[in-house]
């Protein structure tokens, strides 16, 4: 099954280097729910914040979920499962 998800890496241009865009979660204005993350989003010195974003390469280079650090991957998949279960 193909994930309804795009992952971007801005190569460290900002502290929230990675962005996960949840394509199954469309916001009212046509943007998507997303998660911006540093390399260590669950640590006290890390960053992980939900927001909304337009999908596209302005977020960085598209990468596969397997290219994310393990902590980021776990967080993204936890969100993804919750989004998909909400949609029934």
Annotated model-derived regions:
Residues 13-74:
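Acidic, low-complexity, intrinsically disordered interaction modules
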Residues 76-88:
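A short beta-strand-loop micro-motif that forms or neighbors metal/cofactor-
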């Amino acid at each position: 099954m193909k994930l309804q998800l795009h992952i971007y890496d801005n190569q460290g241009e900002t502290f929230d280097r990675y962005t996960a865009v949840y394509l199954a979660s469309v916001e009212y204005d046509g943007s998507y729910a997303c998660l911006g993350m540093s390399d260590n989003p669950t640590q006290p010195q890390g960053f992980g914040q939900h927001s909304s974003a337009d999908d596209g390469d302005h977020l960085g280079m598209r990468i596969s979920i397997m290219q994310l650090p393990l902590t980021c991957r776990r967080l993204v998949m936890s969100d993804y499962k919750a989004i998909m279960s909400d949609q029934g």
